[in-house]
């Protein structure tokens, strides 16, 4: 299907892009890599009258550690995450996630910021950022503000960004020693949206007990979901098989899947149960290996 006509705008900096958003309001959409927005436009799920392309704006594609956090520019492509030595050595959850997005040609174009700003619960990074307890930086006419990721997805295909704000950066707390993470996903074919997926990030103490844990669920609700019941169960514990099974059950209970072409709600809850247990086990193994 061909999208309806629109006016294509190419601002030279963020301030100009914000001014265009102010001018055109809800008729405008930001275009970054286009991996999420363009397919939605072709299906006429999004019909902007104005498309504001920020891909030519410099200074928004970086990955750097600074002041106890990993800072990722919103225009950083998925392939850059795969290639980053910082990500490969310290953030296995991010690496797992980037590798599972579509195919290499798409990952060379699709951006981390776009994956979040589209507000799609089927996208992979929202759950990953929940597990990592990230925050995002938004820039608008009144300056910049930082938004916790738990507050960023209030509803289906909706974000906390104002109409005249642009997501410019993602900030992730640097993990302590003995940390590990994993992203596990079931899809009908490679590169497809998940039937269900689970992101886990944790760190352990000297005895192997979990000090802190984050669990995010992909595509099993109208928004990305934090499996808070399972997090609360596991914090401060050294889980055995029975506790892992209970964590899986609790995560499945926190999910809110709907039946679609990827499976029934019951099937998706079963996936969440199993993937949660596997993601925690793999994260624990990686945490032990990072001591």
Segment roles from a protein language model:
Residues 1-291:
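C-terminal structural segment of proteins
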